[in-house]
């Protein structure tokens, strides 16, 4: 999965997919009542990027729905996964459940079109704080209560705080999550970061007894870091330059080992070579 980083306006969806991304990450900010409000990152952000692109949350969902609904004039067949980077740092811990509820209601209406030929992309809810694990229950309970439990098949999870893997596992246990787990590791492209925790996450993924199904590394803009990540065995790479990742994947060392994921590739299944 080539994951376009910080895609916060509708115009950027086309831009990043056209550059080679089959997945995008977008930043969700919340208001004081725990309503998802804007797609917005703000400053500081990655080196070499404009941090100020933004869109109203529900408008973005509608644009995203068009981009992922077959037959729509804006449809991109290869856009198959969307990571919602949930900026819950502005919320109190006791608002996490409400945030999940409100997120689910908005996605149900504006992205899934109330279950009537909505967008088809897989969704990863990425939470920065382990203490906010109740967001997951709020989200799941709401879809169940609204009669759309089937849509949970399209939803996965990530804790993005670079926490120790055993602590992440504990948070999932508290949340009642047993699958659909992506594990992120990384740092802004302005700073270097080693691969030691990525390798721990990959070991958990491949152990057969861990909770992790997929591992992605962010934010990777250089060919050398891309190669190191692929050598370690990641499933996804988040980048500001999708073309760089696509180029490296076409190199002789990688083109027979990796392929660019399509809709038929189940993002919740641990890959067994």
From Swiss-Prot:
Organ and tissue specificity: Expressed by the venom gland.
Keywords for this protein: Cytolysis, Dermonecrotic toxin, Disulfide bond, Hemolysis, Lipid degradation, Lipid metabolism, Lyase, Magnesium, Metal-binding, Secreted, Toxin
Principal location listed in the UniProt entry: secreted
Cofactor(s) it depends on: Mg(2+)
Catalytic reaction annotation: an N-(acyl)-sphingosylphosphocholine = an N-(acyl)-sphingosyl-1,3-cyclic phosphate + choline; an N-(acyl)-sphingosylphosphoethanolamine = an N-(acyl)-sphingosyl-1,3-cyclic phosphate + ethanolamine; a 1-acyl-sn-glycero-3-phosphocholine = a 1-acyl-sn-glycero-2,3-cyclic phosphate + choline; a 1-acyl-sn-glycero-3-phosphoethanolamine = a 1-acyl-sn-glycero-2,3-cyclic phosphate + ethanolamine
Pfam families assigned to the protein according to its UniProt record, in alphabetical order: GDPD_2
Domain of life: Eukaryota
Designated name of the protein: Dermonecrotic toxin LruSicTox-alphaIC1b
Organism: Loxosceles rufescens (Mediterranean recluse spider)
Taxonomic classification: Eukaryota, Metazoa, Ecdysozoa, Arthropoda, Chelicerata
């Amino acid at each position: 999965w080539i994951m376009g980083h910080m895609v916060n306006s509708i115009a950027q969806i086309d831009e990043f997919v056209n550059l080679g991304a089959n997945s995008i990450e977008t930043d969700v900010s919340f208001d004081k009542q725990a309503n998802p409000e804007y797609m917005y990152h703000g400053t500081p952000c990655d080196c070499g990027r404009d941090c100020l692109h933004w869109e109203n949350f529900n408008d973005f969902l509608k644009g995203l729905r068009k981009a992922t609904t077959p037959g729509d004039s804006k449809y991109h067949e290869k856009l198959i996964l969307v990571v919602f980077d949930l900026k819950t740092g502005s919320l109190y811990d006791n608002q996490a459940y409400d945030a999940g509820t409100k997120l689910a209601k908005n996605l149900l209406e504006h992205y899934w079109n109330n279950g009537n030929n909505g967008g088809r992309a897989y969704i990863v809810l990425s939470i920065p704080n382990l203490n906010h694990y109740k967001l997951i229950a709020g989200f799941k309970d709401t879809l169940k209560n609204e009669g759309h439990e089937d849509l949970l098949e399209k939803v996965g999870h990530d804790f993005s705080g670079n926490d120790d893997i055993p602590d992440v596992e504990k948070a999932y246990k508290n949340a009642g999550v047993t699958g659909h787990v992506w594990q992120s590791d990384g740092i802004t492209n302005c700073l270097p970061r080693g691969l030691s925790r990525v390798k721990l996450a990959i070991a958990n993924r491949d152990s057969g007894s861990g909770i992790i199904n997929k591992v992605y590394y962010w934010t990777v803009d250089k060919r050398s870091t891309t190669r190191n990540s692929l050598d370690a065995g990641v499933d996804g790479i988040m980048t500001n330059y999708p073309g760089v990742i696509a180029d490296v994947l076409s190199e002789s060392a990688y083109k027979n080992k990796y392929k660019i994921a399509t809709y038929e590739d189940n993002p919740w299944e641990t890959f067994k070579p």
